[in-house]
A protein has these predicted regions:
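Short, catalytically relevant binding-site loops at active-site mouths
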Residues: 109-110, 126-130, 145-148
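Loop/turn elements at helix/coil->beta-strand transitions in domains of secreted/extracellular proteins
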Residues: 57-61, 116-119, 136-138, 164-167
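A bilobed periplasmic-binding-protein/Venus flytrap-type ligand-binding module shared by bacterial periplasmic
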Residues: 32-37, 77, 150-162
Length: 170
């Protein structure tokens, strides 16, 4: 438990009230699409979350399980808050019908989309996501209707060997 003197400059909504972690960055969510896979199947890239609910994308979507992945849980939660429970679950139920595979972690969808195993991945959008566009026939897409996000936290482990150095870093 450590609260940096610099933490005061960070909005309270992006840090733990008890000082266990501080938000280092915001990680937005979106889609990574394999252009070749979608073209081969005559599909256009989705532009919105609601597009993913269209049955034409059946078995083309991979995402991490929100029961396992904190990032995917944050994506689910953010969209539900924006849409409201009733509309949100209606849309996610339809998206679920189109998801072929729920990965164990948030790092799995990107490589599988790049490999052409799936046309669409739902994932955290990092600098690395956009770098994939240079190596693979993929496009990273920020959805037009909303961009859910999660804070990327920084913290010091309780049993860290060099807490003084960690405090300087944090």
């Amino acid at each position: 438990q450590y609260e940096s003197p610099e933490a005061e400059a960070i909005d309270a909504g992006y840090r733990d009230k008890d000082g266990y972690w501080t938000g280092l960055a915001l990680v937005p969510a979106g889609f990574l699409v394999n252009n070749d896979v979608l073209e081969e199947k005559g599909l256009e890239a989705p532009k919105t979350w609601e597009d993913l609910a269209d049955p034409k994308y059946k078995d083309e979507i991979i995402m991490a399980s929100p029961a396992i992945s904190g990032t995917q849980y944050a994506i689910l939660n953010g969209t539900l808050q924006a849409w409201g429970e009733e509309k949100g679950w209606e849309i996610w139920t339809a998206i679920n019908d189109n998801v072929d595979f729920y990965a164990k972690g948030g790092g799995e969808p990107g490589p599988k989309v790049c490999a052409g195993e799936y046309g669409i991945g739902i994932l955290a959008m990092t600098g690395g996501t956009f770098a994939l566009e240079k190596e693979y026939p993929v496009t990273a897409i920020y959805p037009e209707d909303m961009i859910p996000w999660t804070p990327a936290p920084i913290a010091i482990f309780k049993n860290s060997e060099n807490k003084d150095a960690a405090k300087v870093f944090v």
